């Protein structure tokens, strides 16, 4: 399966901006009323579209690559990307190792 590995750094960005970036990328669980209610806020990457083998590295399916790059450019994140071939099983299990 064709995929893209994206390496990025958030070293030059503020911590709160990095948090917002990750929330938009992966989504979050928002709790209200002291944790009584939970709402899932979805990100641009659905669950089976990416794998994070280590911090600051994402392996994404080809169809989501441009969305990730557009988000990184909007936040001023430095990144590099390479096209790779991977087994489709890593996206099903969401584990690389």
Q: Can you name each region flagged by the protein language model?
A:
Residues 76-90:
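Conserved short beta-strand edge segments in small beta-sheet-based binding/regulatory domains
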Residues 12-15, 65-67, 86:
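Generic "edge-of-domain/loop-turn" microfeature
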Residues 25:
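Acidic, metal/ion-handling microdomains and their immediate structural contexts
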Residues 92-97:
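Short, low-order "capping/linker" segments at domain edges
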Residues 28-77:
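Short, intrinsically disordered low-complexity segments
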Residues 1-21:
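Short S/T/G/P-rich N-terminal loop/turn motif that feeds into the first structured element of a domain
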